Amino acid sequence: MNQYLVIGGFLGAGKTTSMIAFAEYLSARGLRPAILVNDLGSRSLVDGEFTAASGCFCDEITGDCICYQTEELVDRLRRFRDSSHADIVLSDIPGCGIGGLDHVYHKLAREYPDEFRLCPFTAVADPERLRAILPEQADLNLPEEMRYLFDAQLREAEVILFNKIDTLRPEELARDMAFLREHYGHAKIFAMSARSGAGVAEAADYLISARSALPEVDVGYGGPEFLAAEQRLSWYNRKFFVRKTDGIPVDGNAFISDYFEAVRTRLQAVQRNVPHLKLFANGAGEAAKASLLGVDYGIEFDRSFSAPQTELRCAVNARAACESEVLDFLMDAALRDACRKFGWKLHVFFTECFGMTDEGNE
């Protein structure tokens, strides 16, 4: 019986990084893990490319949440089992997603009762997003409606992974863990850092040894609070190629940073935010991956170029609290400005931008 683990949680909390960290740990234990990346919109998403570059067995389900693609999900799980001989499959759901416990786990248990061993339904939280639901309710320049999604994701989780603890002082970690235990005491809570590896082994060992109890949790899916939150979010995906026509290499990391700064400036000008902007770029024999987790935060590089580049093949994804028409315009303008500054010739292969509740997208 295949083991299957779904990991949800906040936009930018580190779901993909956590899955990769777990996969690397489980591989070292002699198991064969696989990762199934799920998001809305097109194929060739940043998370899929980054996961594949890590060396893990990886596939994607795109176009919609796995909550609504059960037959496709089961087909991929079987393929991992039969072709890759995977012992366990880890998959995420989009960062705005709730209801996965019901729509994924309960449905699999009903319709495929003897085929999959379901690990505890899991959510990743991070210190910055948690600040929005702490008693002081910090202002993260995100719509008020986002607090509902953050809270709902934790309420339906059987396991909470409190990630990025390497960014906290000991007293901050103690405060946040006390809050999680008080308000989400139904869940098993692990403190960890997927980036540094702290706490990864303990969490992974528990997740693969325990089974989901399949609790019934009403998180208000489809209700007015859910719809109000979804209405504030837009998705942007683009694939593009840039090349130096003069052949003189430039700093690819600086180009990515300038592009992100141009996006930040434009979002701030219209008082909008991007809970998660991410880019994966393939250059000459190496790759870079960068993220921006909001207009008030610094740019983070999970991987950077070690040498100047003359051409880059890039995928960029943005999940923004912004109208889709505004987001589409400012993302394009920011990229073209950065390309002009660095002397890149730009070729756009694919772009899509949509609001979660845009007409025709429901």
Predicted regions and their residues:
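P-loop NTP-binding site
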Residues: M1-I7, G12-T17, S209-E362
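Nucleotide-state-sensitive switch-loop elements of NTP-binding domains
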Residues: N2-G8, A13, T17-Y148
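Helical mechanochemical/support elements of P-loop NTPase systems and associated helical scaffolds
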Residues: Q3, Q69-E72, G100, M146-Q153, ...
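Non-catalytic alpha-helical coupling and interface elements of nucleotide-dependent molecular machines
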Residues: T16, S27, L31, A109-P113, ...
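A structural preference for short, hydrophobic beta-strand core positions in alpha/beta folds
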Residues: I35, I189-A191, V348
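Short, aromatic/basic amphipathic alpha-helical patches
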Residues: D47-S54, A174-R181, L330-R336
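A short acidic, often aromatic-flanked loop/helix-cap motif at beta-alpha or helix-coil junctions
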Residues: C65-I66, R195-V200, G285, G355-D358
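Canonical P-loop GTPase G-domain recognition
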Residues: R147-E230
